[in-house]
Amino acid sequence: MSNNIGKVVQVIGPVVDIKFANDELPNIFNAIHIKMDDGKILVCEVEQHVGDDIVRTIAMEATEGLRRGVEAVDTGAPISVPVGECVLGRIFNVLGKPLDSGAEVNNEEKYPIHRPAPSFEEQSVVPQMFETGIKVIDLLAPYQRGGKIGLFGGAGVGKTVLIQELINNIAKEHGGLSVFTGVGERSREGNDLYYEMMESGVIKNTALVFGQMNEPPGARMRVALTGLTMAEYFRDQGQDVLLFIDNIFRFSQAGSEVSALLGRIPSAVGYQPTLATEMGALQERITSTTHGSITSVQAVYVPADDLTDPAPATTFNHLDAKTVLSRSIAEIGIYPAVDPLDSSSRILDPRVVGEEHYEVASKVKHILERYKELQDIIAILGVDELADEDKLIVARARRIQKFLSQPFTVAEQFTGMQGRYVPIKETIRGFKEILEGKHDNVPESAFLFVGTIEEVLEKARTMAQ
């Protein structure tokens, strides 16, 4: 730590102004340590040089009890957090301090949370599909290795279970690791997630980082970078890492909270003028390199369901795929409740996934769209009034809809059904056979909550006995 000492001259909520000697102003993003009267160390981050040898900083913790005249020490470096195997199975805050009841992490290896994005030479330019083992995602809205996925869904439609299954699958099938970052999260949800992960056994392959809803905006604004930094270390070690950010909207929201206090003139809808820059700095670091990959799943809250709001609109620019969870699908008992028509992916392209995959996915979507159109007629007149061709479409669409369901490993204790990981080849083969009419005589209920098409036939034989 440097001997550069300044004094607090102004405190406005989370924004603290500190005066230093003329020739020793700390750099932008440097961490400043302020010793409070109760002995605690308050960490602030330099955001601006405002003139008269004063730097404007954002506090990462509550500023209650802070007063003018207190000494502030420039650490000479940005906030640094522990990285490596020691973070797995643990919960951290924005500063890399443990929040669980475990031991202190005295890891020598630390990374600064502000790091440049990988250079063009380091980045992997070949788009590759990332197999999740979840049929509906792999077939209709496949994830890109090193891509960014938006997860849209309201309360109670299965976001958390889907997140846990992805963590479980990447750990078991790919030997990969996960970092979960709660940005502006409810403490209760973070608590629930931790204990559910402990029960399902995936916690040992996961690091959890939280900046909760009740924390100052500085912590909520930087906690996404803390989680990303931990993920970057594993990527650089050659791992495939899954990074969850819940919720990416809160990252923008926290930035707008401090923006006015930093003296910036608000932009559209009151957001910070630097919204696109801040989002870009975060998102550009989430990428594949020649060593490994970070695949990011980001929950996106849409204020007042307005997709043109600057915060979600800025996020959309960076997404490669979107997975939409639908309440109407959850209500008919199909889980995961992924909407097959609303969900989409940039890499659902024959040049990336192959001709067969693309063709099967297109036909599945076409049949489901036609079934949706016919539902109004069925509701008024009944199925019997349809033309024979449409009756066949309805029969196959219902089988497809049910076959898109799947038992999850992390939900075994609730469902009593053993979880299934379905390789993409099996997924394509199963749906192709349904489209070709090979299973038109198999009862619809046999397609519900199974893995491969063989299991459908086995289930049908059991039902017939």
UniProtKB/Swiss-Prot annotation:
Protein name (Swiss-Prot/TrEMBL): ATP synthase subunit beta
SMART domains membership: AAA (SM00382)
Positions annotated to bind ATP: 153-160
EC number: 7.1.2.2
Protein's membrane topology: Peripheral membrane protein
The species this protein was found in: Clostridium perfringens (strain SM101 / Type A)
The keyword GTP-binding appears for this protein: no
GO CC term, one of those recorded: proton-transporting ATP synthase complex
Protein family according to the UniProt entry: Belongs to the ATPase alpha/beta chains family.
Catalytic activity entry: ATP + H2O + 4 H(+)(in) = ADP + phosphate + 5 H(+)(out)
Pfam families registered for this protein in UniProt: ATP-synt_ab, ATP-synt_ab_N, ATP-synt_VA_C
InterPro entries: AAA+_ATPase (IPR003593), ATP-synt_VA_C (IPR055190), ATP_synth_F1_bsu (IPR005722), ATPase_a/bsu_AS (IPR020003), ATPase_alpha/beta_chains (IPR050053), ATPase_F1/V1/A1_a/bsu_N (IPR004100), ATPase_F1/V1/A1_a/bsu_N_sf (IPR036121), ATPase_F1/V1/A1_a/bsu_nucl-bd (IPR000194)
Keyword list, A-Z: ATP synthesis, ATP-binding, Cell membrane, CF(1), Hydrogen ion transport, Ion transport, Membrane, Nucleotide-binding, Translocase, Transport
PROSITE patterns the UniProt entry points to: ATPASE_ALPHA_BETA
CDD domains hit by this protein: ATP-synt_F1_beta_C (cd18110), ATP-synt_F1_beta_N (cd18115), F1-ATPase_beta_CD (cd01133)
